[in-house]
Amino acid sequence: MISVAYAADAAHAAAHGAFYTEPHFWVDVAFILVVALAFKPVSRAIAAALDARSAKIKSRLDEAHKLREEAQEMLATYQRKQRDAMKEAEEIIAHAKAEAERLAKQAAKDLEVSMKRREQMAMDRIAQAEAQAVREVQNLAVDVAIGAAQKVIGESLSAAQTGSLVDNAIKDLPGKLH
């Protein structure tokens, strides 16, 4: 079978002449020349297009990295702000608790002072009431004694003796008042 193919190929070559006289050969040569001549400019254009695409992709990647860094910085800033806010809130709470304790102590102290003052006022009122009661008892005793003395003197002394005693008492009165 191979021998038949060789024989057919040789017969074909003898019938048509040399290979460079065939139009297929020259079409092939022209195609190769066109491809060879167009290769350099086309490869440059393809390389330029690929370089441009690569540069565009690189710029997008750089922008993405920059955006990522900015996002990380913003995240860190917000986390720091959140920590600071939490710390400030804790400080405010601690201050409020301390202030509440201080106010409670102050209120207890003020209540104690007020209670002592009221107790003192009550004691003063009691002392005044006692003094008033003593004065009233003394006045009542004096009135009773005067009444008894008048009764006794009136029964035992005469009118002349009573007048003499009153006159002597009036004379002694300025010396006893000063």
Curated annotation (Swiss-Prot):
Keywords annotated in UniProt: ATP synthesis, Cell inner membrane, Cell membrane, CF(0), Hydrogen ion transport, Ion transport, Membrane, Transmembrane, Transmembrane helix, Transport
InterPro entries listed in its UniProt record: ATP_synth_b/b'su_bac/chlpt (IPR002146), ATP_synthase_B_chain (IPR050059)
Membrane topology: Single-pass membrane protein
Any Pfam family the entry gives: ATP-synt_B
GO MF entry, a single one: proton-transporting ATPase activity, rotational mechanism
Cellular component GO terms held in the UniProt record: plasma membrane; proton-transporting ATP synthase complex
Subcellular location: Cell inner membrane
Entry-linked CDD domains: ATP-synt_Fo_b (cd06503)
Protein purpose: F(1)F(0) ATP synthase produces ATP from ADP in the presence of a proton or sodium gradient. F-type ATPases consist of two structural domains, F(1) containing the extramembraneous catalytic core and F(0) containing the membrane proton channel, linked together by a central stalk and a peripheral stalk. During catalysis, ATP synthesis in the catalytic domain of F(1) is coupled via a rotary mechanism of the central stalk subunits to proton translocation.
UniProt subunit comment: F-type ATPases have 2 components, F(1) - the catalytic core - and F(0) - the membrane proton channel. F(1) has five subunits: alpha(3), beta(3), gamma(1), delta(1), epsilon(1). F(0) has three main subunits: a(1), b(2) and c(10-14). The alpha and beta chains form an alternating ring which encloses part of the gamma chain. F(1) is attached to F(0) by a central stalk formed by the gamma and epsilon chains, while a peripheral stalk is formed by the delta and b chains.
Protein name: ATP synthase subunit b
